[in-house]
Amino acid sequence: MPIIENHRLVNDPWQHLDETSSLTGRSMVIVPLARLEEALSEWPTGHRGLGVDLPNSARVDDIVQHLARLDIVTVNLPAFNDGRAFSQARSLRHTHRFSGTIRARGTFIPDQYPMLLQAGVDSFEVSTRFTLEEWVAEAHAVPATYQRDYAAGAGLSTRPFAEAQSWAEQPHYG
């Protein structure tokens, strides 16, 4: 799949490994979450080039202790109406201050591109169904932000996190 970073198509240096592929002699690999512990134990300390594919059903807290050793985390959008990857990306980038690459994969369209950028995603595995121009045009097509905390000049570093409630702590009706 094509990769978009900084509004440009780029070559993808990353290899996605499955549950059984060997890590030996490889670099720039993304492993399934189920293999992360194994990969970390085999990966030389201080060696870069390791990433994890975070299922949308997983909690970011499952990988927080390993973020310093990861260069990329992929978040998955298995369906257009499944927005859990937005929350995962936001948590990685803004709550846990992950400085590596966050890549979106799966079923999303150019209309979602600006919101994914606002959530902290900076790399995209995109469908060939749309042109690069269509993706880039959408990057600035939404004049308002999805949440006011993402507005220019009102970065999350100024938000009172101590007073914020997680989604699970908020009252829900219905």
Per-range role (PLM):
Residues 83, 97, 105, 111, ...:
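Residues lining hydrophobic/aromatic ligand-binding pockets adjacent to catalytic sites
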Residues 52-54, 60-65, 109-123:
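Catalytic cores of alpha/beta
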Residues 28, 49-51, 72-74, 101-103, ...:
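Structural preference for beta-strand elements that scaffold enzyme active sites
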Residues 40-47, 61-70:
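Acidic (Asp/Glu)-rich catalytic clusters
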Residues 9, 13-54:
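A positional/architectural concept
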Residues 45-52, 91-104:
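Short beta-strand/loop segments at the ligand-binding rim of alpha/beta enzyme cores
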Residues 34-42, 80-93, 132-142:
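Active-site-adjacent beta->alpha loops and helix N-cap segments on the catalytic face
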Residues 4, 99-101, 110-112, 124, ...:
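Alpha/beta catalytic cores of nucleotide-metabolism and tRNA/nucleoside-modifying enzymes
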